Design a protein with these regions (language model features):
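Active-site glycine-rich loops that stabilize anionic/oxyanionic intermediates
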Residues: 34-37, 109
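Conserved alpha/beta-hydrolase
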Residues: 41, 46-70
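Alpha/beta-hydrolase-fold enzymes
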Residues: 115-171
């Protein structure tokens, strides 16, 4: 397993990993992790995929795992679209290193939402996508949730964790 860093769209460095198979690779799988996670949690799964001939790569989103800057845990500098652009930056680097191989994304939980945004923003960039642990909410619930998020951001500032939102999301 190789650890490396690439620049984040919003500033800072993304902590990345790449697992290489011992056999000739069949394809690349890029993992997009969920909220309150880090790529280290996927080590066993990445090694399993390696045993079946897949290159696996992933980045800790800004504010997660090895990409936390100071006390900005969970914070995407510049917002959601910067996190999506960071996923693309790792894709572009990895695809250039392994030209001609099929490229598969696997997004889990919050990573599934990042991947869904990625799919409609950069549809040409992949051969397949696996969306795991995703969800769908009625428009009214989404609007109410967004309004609450904006209220908490104004109340606390964009870099602070909201105990209320944390409780609503994680219980």
């Amino acid at each position: 397993m190789e650890i490396f860093y690439i620049p984040s769209t919003g500033g800072g460095q993304l902590h990345c990993r790449k697992w290489l198979p011992e056999s000739k690779p069949k394809a690349v799988v890029q993992l997009v992790h969920g909220i309150a996670e880090h790529i280290g949690r996927y080590d066993h799964f990445a090694r399993f995929l390696n045993q079946h001939g897949y290159i696996v790569t992933a980045e800790d989103h800004m504010g997660h795992g090895g990409s936390i800057v100071g006390d900005l845990k969970g914070y995407f500098n510049g917002g959601w679209m910067n996190a999506v652009a960071d996923v693309k930056a790792l894709h572009d680097k990895t695809a250039a290193e392994h030209p001609g191989l099929p490229y598969i994304f696997l997004g889990h939980s919050m990573g599934s939402f990042l991947l869904r945004t990625y799919l409609y923003t950069y549809p040409e960039a992949l051969n397949a996508a696996i969306i795991s642990g995703t969800g769908w909410q009625p428009a009214a619930a989404l609007k109410a949730g967004l309004a609450l998020c904006k209220f908490e951001e104004k109340r606390l500032g964009e870099t602070k964790t909201s105990p209320l939102l944390n409780s609503l999301i994680f219980g």
